[in-house]
Amino acid sequence: ELGFTRARGPEAATEWYNFEALTTPLDHPAADEQDTLYLEGGGLLRSHTSPVQVRTLQNPQPPIRILAPGWVYRRDTYDATHTPAFLQVEGLVVDEGVSFVDFKATLAEFARRLWGPGTQVRFRPSFFPFTEPSAEVDVKRVITLPDGSTRETDWLEIMGAGMVDPNVLEAAGVDSERYTGFAFGMGPGRIAMLKYGVTDLRTFFENDVRFLNQFTGPSGPVGPASESTGVPSPEARHRGGGELR
């Protein structure tokens, strides 16, 4: 309904697509081997889906309005909020006259469609190498508890976003004097954690059907998802406290 189409790209990338085309120098900490998974013989596993944005900018000329979902890879520990491989969705809008007002209105509409019309949205100044200005997007919403009562959540960060740096447009061959745009990125796993009250990201990877079956309906659980499925928690299992049989 918002006019986006899906775009995909390879999970293996060059340093240019993953970093340099996005105004991230190769001496940036994100490009270090401690954070990025490099391949023998050259190349790397993409650490975000932003290379899809660059490839899209190189091919069809604006207007562009895409969502780029896919797996990304980082040298992260496997814990309650991080995994070394995870899904990411990035969005890109580029056209003549795209402004910061368009940026805020689109992302606010996205949040309200996902969590309901009463969702509050705020934008906090931030920094990303490939957007300027940049912002973190937070939401606050009212949730229904198991006993039927309601309460307002704290502010929760859901994505990073910003206006596309003109240098990114120029690197891909797009006239930055004529076109402007914005980009945003989020992790569906963390979005699901916020939406359904899941506290441990690893639960989604444990293949416990008693947990996963809660999401088989058209819209998932009516209320917070239950992680109390009668099996040891992911934290306990990774401490050697039990295993699924």
What does each of the following model-derived ranges do?
Residues 235-245:
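Long, low-complexity, intrinsically disordered segments
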Residues 1-227, 244-245:
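TRNA-recognition modules of translation machinery and tRNA-sensing kinases, especially anticodon-binding
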